[in-house]
UniProtKB/Swiss-Prot annotation:
A GO MF label: ATP binding
Family under the similarity heading: Belongs to the class-II aminoacyl-tRNA synthetase family. Type 1 subfamily.
CDD domains on file: AspRS_core, EcAspRS_like_N
Lineage per the UniProt record: Bacteria, Bacillati, Mycoplasmatota, Mollicutes, Mycoplasmataceae
Binding site for L-aspartate: E169, R215, H438, R479
Protein name listed in UniProt: Aspartate--tRNA ligase
Length: 575
């Protein structure tokens, strides 16, 4: 029979109605002569009542059995305010077991004490948990808001190919061998970058898609080998146009999903200032903890670690807490991960100074430190010395650790900003050359146009990242549409004419036929969903993710394939 209602639908308005419900048995409780059953589906939970005369209906019934019941809705004597259906219950008149269930390998509750690989192995069970279903519901809502908003602004949703050409820039590609074209490979795209720019040349002036992308890179909590982007591009538009639409869209999402208001325009911070103040190009602004440079305070110091300070920076973070020995040791271990031996620290409480450097401080330095950090009653200063980039990274990481130690990362608070004025190039130690910091189609800023290819160290990109709560959730740029500038860019990243023609000739040919200026952005929808659901990992907002080693624990992919399949592809494996 067809269900008349879901398990999250019945209210007092349905009292005395005969209903049919279908779902999974969540819990069975005996109370005197009666038995109570919690029946669940993705919409909620309804309490069922089995009276004494119908007790035979539940012989051998167990948790996670799939059942169908028919019964009468009645008002509950004791209301359960945690449930939408908490004012009613259903007196069961008939019950059918649709399918039985074995004992599940872990309890299907929101708080579950089981390792993640077990959850991923039985992902279909893990997804029965309400918290996981809510994550997918919120993710679907975000997608729905995006589609409605962009469609109303005349954006056209266009699909681009998954089988593409491998190009030399960016992260590693996943390669797909072609059976029909021996010894040749497709690449799964890291983004639809070139295709969306071709759509601009095609006259599709406002494009978007919610698209799967692929990168063969090391994994972490906010990365997967396959991930989902909102990809967006606009013709006859500048960076400002893209940023304005992005701000309005993220404002709408936060309002409708979290009932959280943000003010436009968002804060803008240059890449240089982000590194200087927060040690990161994706700073979490839910807490202060700015990084300070203390070279002036210690310039004539006799402190041994600061004697050799030429071309080095003394940088510090201060928190109005007194760190314990255990907490300081945690920061020491973190410093070693950044190739520092340890951290130095200074504690002050009611003008009493202690710590690894306290005895070596002059009274003048103490006064300067109090003024520098605006210390009131107590504080701990964490500091070290090193090359600017390295010490800034360390202090940025320590800043985050301190926030976690003292619960400064406020839940349901969302701090957004734009990081702008990125370097156009970054130096690759591995390749011993400058490479494009984003991709070679990012336009230099106007002030860098004259010499970006000869002054690579200082060249700035017309690029922008959208940051929320310490995560980069979007990144975009103004694109190069001038063939002369594009050629200079290829030369700057040491791609010769033969390489350009082989890898990008098909793309560059399109620019011979009239290209509008255009700009765009890509949002990481997995990361946005992770933040808005307060999840610990993007794996918790993806239905069937890979684990931290890139393995699908259910199907054991990737896996070996047969020799016959390899022969068809003209591939041999090497042990």
């Amino acid at each position: 029979m067809k269900r008349t209602h879901t398990c999250g639908e019945l209210t007092l308005q349905n009292v005395d109605q005969k209903v049919i419900l279908q779902g999974w048995v969540k819990k069975i409780r005996k109370l005197g002569a009666m038995v109570f059953i919690d029946l669940k589906d993705r919409y909620g939970i309804t309490q069922l009542v089995i009276e004494q005369e119908n007790i035979n209906l539940i012989n051998n019934l167990k948790n996670e059995y799939v059942i169908e019941i028919s019964g009468i809705v009645v008002k509950r004597k004791s209301v359960n305010k945690e449930l939408i259906t908490g004012e009613i219950e259903v007196i069961v008149k008939d019950l059918l077991v649709i399918n039985k269930s074995e004992l599940t390998p872990f309890v299907l509750e929101n708080d579950v004490n089981v390792n993640e690989d077990t959850r991923l192995t039985y992902r279909y069970l893990d997804l029965r948990r309400q918290v996981m279903q809510n994550n997918l519901i919120i993710r679907a809502k975000i997608n729905h808001i995006i589609r409605n908003y962009l469609t109303d602004l005349n954006f056209l949703e266009v699909e681009t190919p998954y089988f593409a050409k491998s190009t030399p820039e960016g992260a590693r590609h996943f390669l797909v061998p072609s059976r029909l074209n021996k010894n040749k490979f497709y690449a799964l795209p890291q983004s639809p970058q070139l295709f969306k720019q071709l759509l601009m040349i095609s006259g599709i002036d406002r494009y978007y898609q919610i698209v799967r992308c692929f990168r063969d890179e090391d994994l972490r909590i906010d990365r997967q080998p396959e991930f989902t982007q909102l990809d967006l591009e606009m013709s006859f538009a500048t960076s400002e146009d893209v940023m304005q639409i992005s701000e309005s869209l993220i404002k709408k999402i936060l309002k409708e999903v979290k009932n959280f208001e943000i003010k436009e325009p968002l804060l803008r911070l240059s890449y240089k200032d982000a590194i200087d103040l927060y040690g990161s190009d994706k700073p979490d602004l839910r807490y202060e903890l700015k990084i300070h440079t203390l070279n002036d305070i210690f310039k004539n110091s006799d402190i041994k670690m600061f004697l050799d300070s030429q071309n080095k920076y003394i940088r510090a973070v201060c928190i109005d807490q007194l760190l314990t020995k255990k907490q300081l040791e945690e920061l020491n271990q973190q410093a070693k991960q950044f190739h520092f031996n340890s951290i130095a620290f200074i504690k002050v409480e009611n003008n009493a100074w202690s710590g690894s450097l306290a005895s070596q401080l002059t009274e003048v330095q103490k006064k300067q430190l109090i003024e520098e950090f605006n210390i009131q009653n107590k504080a701990t200063i964490i500091l070290n010395i090193g090359k600017y980039e390295e010490i800034s990274q360390l202090m940025g990481a320590i800043r985050i650790s301190l926030a976690k130690m003292f619960n400064l990362e406020t839940k349901d608070d969302f701090k957004l900003l734009w990081v702008v004025d990125f370097p156009l190039f970054e130096f690759s130690e591995q390749e011993n050359r400058y490479v494009a910091a984003h991709h070679p189609f990012t336009s230099p800023k106007e002030e860098s146009l004259a010499d970006f290819d000869t002054n690579k160290k200082d060249a700035l990109a017309c690029a922008y990242d959208l940051v929320m709560n310490g995560f980069e959730i979007g990144g975009g740029s103004q694109r190069i549409t001038n063939s002369e500038i594009q050629q200079r860019m290829f030369d700057a990243v040491e791609l010769n004419q033969k390489q350009v023609e082989a890898n990008f000739g098909w793309f560059m040919n399109a620019y011979k036929y009239g290209a509008p200026y255009h700009a765009g952005i890509a949002w990481g929808l997995d990361r946005i969903s992770m933040i808005l659901t307060d999840s610990n990992s993007i794996r918790d907002v993806i239905a069937f993710p890979k684990n931290s080693l890139g393995i699908d624990m259910m199907s054991n992919a990737p896996d070996l394939v047969s020799d016959k399949q390899l022969d068809e592809l003209n591939i041999k494996t090497v042990e």
